[in-house]
Amino acid sequence: DLARVIFTAIYKGVVPGVYHFSDEGVCSWYDFAKAIHRIAGITTCKVSPLHTNEYPAKAPRPHYSVLDKTKVKTTYNIEIPHWEESLEACIKELNA
């Protein structure tokens, strides 16, 4: 998805600036892992949630860090797919 946006920016003409990009929707790492298990049909192991304070990190992490994609969407007039849709397409391609 990011490669498509970069191609679009190059094709339409790059407008200088800082752009944020991620697929639509929000999820935690736990939600992401559960979706991978569900989409890939993995049943051999369990995904368990882990609170941020249980996972040591060298840098402090924000509690909520969703990116605002308004600028990239309006500048290049693009539709961004939902992360689960893109994840499903990726897993299907990997399994092909």
Predicted regions mapped to residue ranges:
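Short, surface-exposed acidic
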Residues: 44-47, 80-84
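Short aromatic/basic micro-patch
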Residues: 26, 49, 66-67, 80
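Amphipathic terminal alpha-helices
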Residues: 83-96
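Mid/C-terminal beta-alpha module of Rossmann-like enzyme folds, strongest
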Residues: 5, 9-58
